[in-house]
Amino acid sequence: MCIRDRLVRGISLEINQGEIVTLIGPNGSGKTTTAKMILNILNTDEGLVTGKARKMAYVPQKINIDWTMPLRVIDFMKITNSLNNTQITESLSMTGVDELLYNQIHSLSGGEFQRVLIARAIAKKPDLLVLDEPVQGVDFNGEIALYNLIKEISVNLNCGILLISHDMHFVMSTTDHVICLNGHICCSGSPSNVVKNPEYIKLFGQHNSETLSYYQHHHDHSHNHDGSISK
């Protein structure tokens, strides 16, 4: 007899145009699985994935690249993606790295590479953009700049964004709606309400709740794509 555990169950969520919804939870809680079901990469055992999103784009948590292989940004953008040069330059410009068009992929910093990945995903102007841990390998200032970029994309493209992140401080200042998963939805709502929820506190601790309740990144400056500050 084969017994299969369900990775996630009872998941119900809604992502509207121009809205950022963030999935949080411990490792193995079903965040990436949920995202892949929404993208129809994985099939559901029960229930339906419905919506009006005609075009969906995905930036996975990990991407396998042979960093020793000569590969320019413009060529990387075209791999398994039928993009014309106008789409490529426009999307790279939107993510602030259009000057890197002919640079080698292996020469990019962590933040620059993430911006190229996001540019590749938004080149065809998706209705829904799914970002799985989009700031991996990026320093603190770069993280701030990337989360600001994600917010700009949601506004400028009026697309829904499903974000998976462990960076709680940035989640609290960037997202519109938080869903806390641990195999099922433990709690959901606005960031300020979720951090006070008993289920959230049970998972992440009272100190975390008090620290994050309610963090926002206030400033009178902007961040460049490398994380540096411009007045």
Each model region followed by its residue ranges:
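Conserved ABC ATPase "signature" region
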Residues: 85-100
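ABC ATPase nucleotide-binding domains
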Residues: 203-231
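Conserved ABC ATPase signature
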Residues: 104-108, 112
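H-loop (His-switch) and adjacent beta-strand-loop-beta switch element
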Residues: 178-190
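H-loop/switch region of ABC-family ATPase nucleotide-binding domains
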Residues: 165-166
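Catalytic Walker B motif of ABC-type/P-loop ATPase nucleotide-binding domains
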Residues: 129-133
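Conserved catalytic motifs of ABC-family nucleotide-binding domains
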Residues: 125
